Amino acid sequence: MNRKVTAIALAAIIWATAAQGFLMFKQGRCLCIGPGMKAVKMAEIEKASVIYPSNGCDKVEVIVTMKAHKRQRCLDPRSKQARLIMQAIEKKNFLRRQNM
């Protein structure tokens, strides 16, 4: 009897853990933790992207991929460099829409 109760309790804990992880995954989350860096060397940036607020994250995130080791870094969206990157991406997207 004791083994049966233990097995049921263990199964319930495993199910609850899996269900909780699934719900967190569906909700999404921010990619950047903390305020982010003020600036990085422009020559070391391979790619930049801006992620606007959504249901999963309520803040603007500026993420740059570095040439060395393909590491990603988060920039503070209020920093001068991040604002310049966001303007450049918006201009590029605007021009792309104009050419369609």
Curated annotation (Swiss-Prot):
Subunit structure: Interacts with TNFAIP6 (via Link domain).
Designated name of the protein: C-X-C motif chemokine 11
Coiled coil: none
One GO cellular component term noted in the UniProt record for this chain: extracellular space
Swiss-Prot/TrEMBL keywords: Chemotaxis, Cytokine, Disulfide bond, Inflammatory response, Secreted, Signal
UniProt keyword DNA damage, yes or no: no
Role: Chemotactic for interleukin-activated T-cells but not unstimulated T-cells, neutrophils or monocytes. Induces calcium release in activated T-cells. Binds to CXCR3. May play an important role in CNS diseases which involve T-cell recruitment. May play a role in skin immune responses.
Gene Ontology terms, MF aspect: chemokine activity; CXCR3 chemokine receptor binding
Gene behind this protein: Cxcl11
InterPro entries named among the record's database cross-references: Chemokine_b/g/d, Chemokine_CXC, Chemokine_CXC_CS, Chemokine_IL8-like_dom, CXC_Chemokine_domain, Interleukin_8-like_sf
PROSITE patterns hit by this protein: SMALL_CYTOKINES_CXC
Localization per record: Secreted
Species lineage: Eukaryota, Metazoa, Chordata, Craniata, Vertebrata
Signal peptide stretch: 1-21
A Gene Ontology BP annotation from the UniProt entry: immune response
